[in-house]
């Protein structure tokens, strides 16, 4: 049973991860691979709204996706977007990235190899990773405008969609930790962390929501 205090702290981290960017037309949309097909669905919706003429889906597989997405996250995203009416010619697949940094670097390399001019990117991620994705993208590709979006959901609705409240809170704590650790390792830009967010993070760690934490000397994940 998860207490009301834990839920309140998780909500603070959830809200902090939301960047609050308003989608507008960009040169390209990049959908970051994961277990969550909602990223592909949101990217497809944005395409149909005219927010980007080209989509890059990026991602190999991970320990959480190798069984349900055996052809790779990017390929499963592509298939879902095509099911939703996105033309195959509008989709590029980057199948090798295994972390957020590689998502950005390899997508950039793919677009540059194709000679596609990029001045702005619609970056589509899971709801609890908007800020992490933004900080990584700004570090690795600083000379373009980044507009971060995700599926519009409340925390309770997202937990219901995943079916595992503890896992979602673990992932929130892990995303928050990376915002603090990775800038020191050169993986992200530094962002100010408000005191209430730090307090919520420490409370959740103290309650054992630690399965998605990384050692502070670990490579990027």
Swiss-Prot record:
Keyword NADP attributed: no
Keyword Nucleotide-binding assigned: no
Keywords: DNA-binding
Gene3D superfamilies from the UniProt entry: HUPs
DNA-binding region: 77-96
Cellular component aspect of the GO annotation: plasma membrane
Gene Ontology molecular function: DNA binding
Taxonomic superkingdom: Bacteria
Cross-referenced InterPro entries: Cell_Envelope_Assoc, DUF218, Rossmann-like_a/b/a_fold
Pfam family, one: DUF218
PANTHER family: DUF218 DOMAIN-CONTAINING PROTEIN (PTHR30336:SF20), INNER MEMBRANE PROTEIN, PROBABLE PERMEASE (PTHR30336)
Protein purpose: The imp locus inhibits the extrachromosomal maintenance of the streptomyces plasmid SLP1. May function as a transcriptional activator.
Family named by the database record: To E.coli YdcF.
Protein name: Uncharacterized protein SCO4629
Organism: Streptomyces coelicolor (strain ATCC BAA-471 / A3(2) / M145)
Source species taxonomy: Bacteria, Bacillati, Actinomycetota, Actinomycetes, Kitasatosporales
């Amino acid at each position: 049973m998860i207490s009301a205090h834990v839920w309140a702290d998780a909500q603070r981290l959830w809200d902090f991860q939301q960047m609050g960017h308003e989608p507008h037309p960009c040169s390209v949309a990049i959908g970051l691979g994961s277990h969550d097909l909602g990223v592909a669905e949101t990217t497809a919706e944005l395409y149909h709204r005219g927010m980007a003429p080209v989509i890059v889906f990026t991602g190999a597989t991970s320990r959480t996706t190798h069984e349900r997405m055996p052809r790779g996250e990017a390929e499963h995203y592509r298939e879902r977007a095509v099911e939703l009416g996105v033309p195959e010619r509008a989709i590029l697949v980057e199948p090798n990235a295994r972390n957020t940094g590689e998502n950005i670097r390899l997508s950039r390399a793919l677009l540059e190899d194709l000679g596609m001019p990029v001045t702005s990117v619609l970056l589509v991620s899971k709801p609890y990773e908007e800020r992490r994705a933004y900080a990584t993208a700004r570090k690795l590709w600083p000379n373009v405008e980044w507009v971060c979006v995700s599926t519009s959901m409340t925390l309770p609705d997202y937990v219901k969609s995943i079916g595992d409240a503890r896992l979602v809170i673990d992932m929130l704590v892990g995303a928050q930790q990376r915002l603090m650790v990775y800038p020191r390792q050169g993986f992200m830009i530094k962002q100010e962390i408000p005191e209430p967010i730090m307090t919520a993070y420490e409370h959740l760690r103290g309650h054992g929501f630690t399965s998605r934490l990384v050692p502070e000397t670990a490579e990027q994940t």
